[in-house]
Amino acid sequence: MESLLLARLPEAYVVFSPLVDVFPVIPVFFLLLAFVWQAAVGFR
């Protein structure tokens, strides 16, 4: 389905395809950020 969606995108959006590849990593990044923040405040 994802390849079908990317195939339908206009030529202008081809530039953003590397950005779309990064999107699934963002929730993991926020989870790590929350963990680091809790470690910084001492797990209150």
Swiss-Prot record:
Keywords assigned: Chloroplast, Membrane, Photosynthesis, Photosystem II, Plastid, Reaction center, Thylakoid, Transmembrane, Transmembrane helix
Cited InterPro entries: PSII_PsbK, PSII_PsbK_sf
SUPFAM superfamilies, alphabetized: Photosystem II reaction center protein K, PsbK
Membrane-crossing segments per the record: 23-43
Pfam families xref list: PsbK (PF02533)
Function according to Swiss-Prot or TrEMBL: One of the components of the core complex of photosystem II (PSII). PSII is a light-driven water:plastoquinone oxidoreductase that uses light energy to abstract electrons from H(2)O, generating O(2) and a proton gradient subsequently used for ATP formation. It consists of a core antenna complex that captures photons, and an electron transfer chain that converts photonic excitation into a charge separation.
Subunit structure, as described in the record: PSII is composed of 1 copy each of membrane proteins PsbA, PsbB, PsbC, PsbD, PsbE, PsbF, PsbH, PsbI, PsbJ, PsbK, PsbL, PsbM, PsbT, PsbX, PsbY, PsbZ, Psb30/Ycf12, at least 3 peripheral proteins of the oxygen-evolving complex and a large number of cofactors. It forms dimeric complexes.
Name the record gives this protein: Photosystem II reaction center protein K
Organism: Thalassiosira pseudonana (Marine diatom)
Source species taxonomy: Eukaryota, Sar, Stramenopiles, Ochrophyta, Bacillariophyta
Gene name per UniProt: psbK
